[in-house]
Amino acid sequence: MRRSIAITGATGFVGGVLLKRLASTDWQIRALVRPASMHKRPSQVVSEWVAGDLEDMESLRRLVAGVDAVVHCAGAVRGAGLVNFERINVDGVARLVLAARAQHPKPRFFLISSLAAREPHLSHYAASKRKGEEALALNAGSMPWVILRPSAVYGPGDLELLPLFRWMCRGIAPVIGSAKSRFSLLYVEDLAEAIVCYLKSGMGLGRSYEMHDGHAGGYSWGDIIDAVARVNGRTVYQIKIPVPLVMLGATFNLAAARMCGRAPMLTPGKVRELTHPNWVGDNTALTRDTGWIPQVTLDEGLRQTLRQDRAACRK
């Protein structure tokens, strides 16, 4: 009998790549899709689509009914205030956990969180990701669960980091923060492979794991700029932008977004995240418990990302 898995965020960046990876396994896939995103559904991958969202308890019950595993990829990455993030990243997690916990037998629950949860004081986003993790631990009961905390995820289809890579392809790298800041990255296909490895292993339940691409000590902005220059065959010039100037712009952007009812990406909280000196992850525990080893180097990941977005290097 085929095992079944429920996925949220399946039409998004990470969820879409995970669907493609699971399509080559024996998992039978059921996925949640918002009615407004029905046109984004990939064909011949998902066995059943459940129309609904994280605020609709009935659709969540249908999503998880009788499944062996739940992978929660959906989440809010932008918002005008804490309540906007918590509605999805905290309350949505709690509802899905309660729906899954009510199943017999109970499925294994995988929450795709973020390394940002390590520093909840920095932003509303980071705080909501930490609270979402706490909501899982608080409401899971005897249901087995795992939290994955990937570092910054990039790859073809990513709309958050691609604008930065496009600027670098044009020869300009706008940089804020200290030259001493270090951060880890993770190619999206390596993240999907880690989830599949964990589905096979069943180890380390009831804990969280950090993840990155295996580059010890992370990267500096100079490392990223040099990698883009190698891949693109073009010199990239770094332009240092003063943090107070960026913070001022972020403050005005947030105020304008609130007036217009938009969900902004650039906010004072996001600036604090970007200028935090240490976003270096640690793969040790995850590799020990699952055998997962990231395969995609930074140069190869950038090459694949920019190849899929040829306009990035033409404009």
Per-range role (PLM):
Residues 134-156:
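Conserved beta-loop-beta element that borders a ligand/cofactor-binding pocket
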Residues 163-188, 235-278:
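Alpha-helical membrane-targeting segments
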Residues 201-265, 296-306, 312-315:
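Mid/C-terminal beta-alpha module of Rossmann-like enzyme folds, strongest
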Residues 5-25:
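N-terminal Rossmann NAD(P)H-binding glycine-rich loop of SDR-like oxidoreductase domains
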Residues 72, 91-130, 146:
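Conserved Rossmann-fold NAD(P)-dependent oxidoreductase catalytic core, especially the SDR/UDP-sugar
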Residues 37-38, 43, 47-91, 101, ...:
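NAD(P)H-binding glycine-rich loop region in Rossmannoid oxidoreductase-like domains
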Residues 159-163, 177-200, 206-210, 220-223:
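Substrate-positioning beta->alpha
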Residues 86-90, 122-133, 154, 158, ...:
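Short-chain dehydrogenase/reductase
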